[in-house]
Amino acid sequence: MGAAVAALAAPLLLAAANLAVPPRSELNRPWPFFTAEEPEEPPLRAPIDALNSFAMPPGYAVELVAAEPLVQDPILMEFDGDGRLWVMELPGWAHNLSMENSLEPVNRLVVLDDTDNDGVFDNRTVFADKLVLPRAFKILAGGCALIGEPPTLWKACDTDRDLKADTKEKVADGFARLGVLEHGANGLFWGMDNLLVVSEHEWNVAYKAGQFATVPGLRRGQWGVTQDDAGRIYRNVNTDPLFVDYVSPDYYARNPDLVRTRGLYENLVDQEKTNIWPAHPTFGLNRGYRREVFRADGTASYYGGVSSPLIYRGTRLPADVQGMGFVADGATNIVHLLRLKDDGQGRMAAEDFYAKGEFLASTDVRFRPTALAGGPDGSFYVADMYRGVSQDGPLQTDYLRDYITKRGLARGIGHGRIYRVVHVSANGAAAPMPRDARPQMSRDTTAALVAHLSHPNGWWRDTAQQHLVQRADPKSEPLLVKLAKDLKADWRSRLHALWTLDGMGAMRADLALLAMRDAKAELRAAGLRLAESSLAKGDQKLIKAVLTLAGDGNWQVRLQAAATLGALPDAARTQPMIALLSVHGDDPVLVDAALSGLKGNELPVLTALAAARAAPREAVAMLAGALAKRRDAATGQQLVALAARDDLPAPVRTALLDGLALGFAGGAQTGGNAVAGGRAGGNIPGVSRQRGGGNRFELPADPRSLAVLAAGKDALAEPAKKLLALVTWPGRPAPPALPPRSASEEALFRRGQSIYVEQCSGCHQVQGQGQATVAPPLAGSKRVAANGDVPVRILTNGLEGKIGLMPPLGSAMNDEEVAAVLTYVRQSWGNTGTPLPPAAVKEWRLAFAHRTTPGSEKDIDAPQR
């Protein structure tokens, strides 16, 4: 740490040194706490004073462990294997009074250290600087780190052990693009299966034999990734606090013909039953002008912008919060706690932990929790960017921008705080749960690292696994095998041992088989995944075990078996799939997991299921959808004929018609707790490769039976009409074709496609089908194809519609970018609007520049004179 920084930090550090514990928030303050005070210009609070703004449930407090200038503008953090805290600092975000993001290389990755082990960080080293709007980082063994700096994923290393990177190599291109910060690739979370999970992006990162490589995934989540003890991945998005992946994304990526991906990114929280309880009025939100959605005291009742989920797996807080979910909501100055529930079968749900009141709420509008991270001491930490602004400028409504300006909230950058969450006894003494000793994993022996896999604190287990995989010491293998086989060991330790062996390329079929026969469901499910490399080789013992587990009494084991069946040799796959789906084919999550492994084998499975006495409608519809999406003419004709057979039960025929329509339209379907394609920009594999325009699927012959159904008056008529509108055949008049685009219009269209996928598909979906309660469909939208002023006004001024707020995303785009993305949506998915030239966009923007709030649907639809 430089002398100037040290001098500035001295008062804070001396204050900490004179106390038995680091500076701490007030214990047992009245809770829930609320103040109606709303200063016209909220003051900047010194770090010590900011502690007085917090209210927590009885027994809880936060300790101040770092503050400016030691840390500034923190957005991400992670502890390394030696107990140092790495922090991504983003001073370039909203860096001026106009709240613009700087494209100058002013951001950095720093390392904080507590050199005297008093619980307060006192040293700062800049590992990497001169970064342009970085979105992610991941600490690696050997003094290295992955850094996501759009559009590049870098690996930077410190080769002389001074904690300063002196080498940098490119790992991959295409890691997001410079644009709206909250919709950029992030995460790089090292999961139990050794896959580095990336949120808001279409690929993840795999580590094999010392090398990193991108692997196909599905775009999910928005900001942050976490996992539970079983290795299930959790994410969140915008105003929805927690989603879970029951199935790994690589399964769905293997079949581009899927029309749905249930089991991936399942919503755990009922929006109608969850509430937040801020400690002060929260009108400083994008929709703060809609006072009717606030409580009488001025507080929002629903999340303003969640991020950084954390499943707490530490040991220093009480048992009732271990395994529970924490989420930050910087927009409303809270950290919310969710109670996770497992129904005993692996199906998860989440609800508010407290009926009223927040786990952590601040009366300071500048408390902006951006990241939560478990620590080696058994507690967890909160990074506070300490800014008056929390909404990315391009997404701000005019109301919010005016609110920020009037209150001076854009002033005061360069601050930042890190807090440790603690639990204390009634008299304020330290809780009986001591902090874990500081780790030294970079210097630990291989045997010591293996021993850490049995640590009760999940941080130690995760970090030790990562070090062992990267170290790849052959001496660890017998120790790991011994632990994996130890039936008396904690199941979590055995699970880590198995995945560590797999990450080292040392997984054995006998170990997978042992896990598949275990009494613990989590181990049986893991054993199925770990067996897959041997299944393709025809290992009969493993194949038999997999078929047995397809009938397991536990849902999560059956679900994994459904996905794993896809790893069987083709000849051995069809009959087990038929058997499984005949019994469980109305479970949408299991159906999609099974179909992910059926590419090329859907037709015989569908034929068998449709002929069954009690055909499972869910499986029938999704199989028909996958086959239709493949767009094979002969198969399409065959399936239309199948749906027209009057000897099949009407529900089965309806399922066939619905599935075919979904597939011909390109997917994707929502339902249940799923968010189709993922709330934040999820693409179902292959969907983005569908052609734009109104191209109907061409059948080889006139489907007269379908026309008969469509002309009927029973329940089959409507789905038949819907399907009939999506197909054509020789002799049927073609729909009006779009005029050819000029070279400049084509360039505009292509550029718009890129912008749309990056910034719009999160809500409206890749195929423009929209999402219920989130965003309306753009495919077939009259407003999209209306006179140019309508879509321009919606994109640049925003729209307050029946579903909710469309933010003025286009306000941060130049005229050409607005023209490009609108040209793309106006000429895709059957839309027939004309291209929009940048000059027209400029004209309409100027005409409606006086608007200060998003327009209403009535305003937008009113004719302009």
Question: What function would you assign to each model-found segment?
Answer:
Residues 2-15:
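Bacterial N-terminal signal peptides
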Residues 17-448, 459, 469, 543:
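Beta-propeller domains with acidic blade repeats across secreted/periplasmic ectodomains
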Residues 22-41, 679-680, 734-746, 808-809, ...:
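Flexible coil segments in periplasmic/lumen-exposed cytochrome c-class electron-transfer proteins
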Residues 209-210, 356-357, 398-406, 563, ...:
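Short beta-alpha connecting loops at secondary-structure transitions
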Residues 372, 383, 418-421, 752-766, ...:
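The canonical Cys-X-X-Cys-His
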Residues 383, 408-414, 422-754, 837, ...:
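Long, ordered, helix-rich scaffold segments
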Residues 745-769, 783-797:
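Sequence/structural segment immediately N-terminal to covalent heme-attachment motifs in c-type
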Residues 777-793, 797, 801-819, 827-832:
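Electron-transfer interface patches adjacent to heme c in soluble/periplasmic c-type cytochromes
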